[in-house]
């Protein structure tokens, strides 16, 4: 997911300028080829819009939005799993903590009136190790999840901006 988001975020700053120039020069096929060669979610979205040139503007806009939704869905593919790990790992660690403490109290009860510290150490060790384990897994997953969500939101903003720019290109008069 990280690699897909990273690849999707790369866009040539001149991409839309080149698309505008090709469309205004009537080089529709060249514009489509540029989109295919660029191979990013934004390029695929614009390619679908170019393929709809000549149809009503609402059809063009709908086609672009459909591709954008599909592309965002692909990018979000692994995020629910990562969110589950981020939320679940600390809870599993906490469960281990509770089980370790239960073990400690059971050992204390079994020992009767004399409590040896080494007897308590085993259960407390389990409690602390599982807590640490859950946090070691959960914290990076939490930060990773939020980082990827922020990257996707930035990409969605770029997709919206490029969609608007493309619709503006289609609304410009053709220069001869």
Which residues does each PLM region occupy?
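Predominantly long cytosolic amphipathic alpha-helical stalk/bundle segments
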Residues: 9-95, 99-111, 143-176
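Glycine-rich helix-loop "coupling/hinge" segments at transmembrane-helix boundaries
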Residues: 107-126
């Amino acid at each position: 997911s990280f690699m897909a988001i990273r690849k999707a975020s790369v866009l040539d700053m001149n991409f839309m300028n080149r698309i505008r120039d090709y469309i205004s020069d009537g080089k529709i096929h060249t514009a489509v080829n540029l989109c295919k060669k660029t191979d990013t979610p934004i390029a695929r979205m614009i390619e679908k819009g170019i393929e709809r040139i000549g149809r009503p503007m609402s059809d063009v806009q709908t086609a672009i939005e459909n591709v954008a939704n599909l592309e965002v869905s692909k990018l979000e593919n692994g995020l629910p799993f990562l969110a589950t790990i981020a939320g679940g790992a600390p809870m599993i660690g906490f469960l281990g903590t509770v089980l370790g403490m239960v073990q400690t109290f059971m050992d204390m009860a079994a020992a009767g009136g004399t409590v040896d510290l080494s007897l308590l150490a085993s259960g407390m060790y389990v409690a602390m190790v599982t807590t640490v384990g859950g946090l070691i897994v959960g914290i990076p997953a939490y930060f990773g999840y939020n980082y990827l969500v922020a990257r996707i939101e930035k990409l969605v903003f770029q997709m919206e901006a490029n969609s608007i720019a493309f619709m503006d290109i289609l609304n410009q008069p053709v220069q001869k």
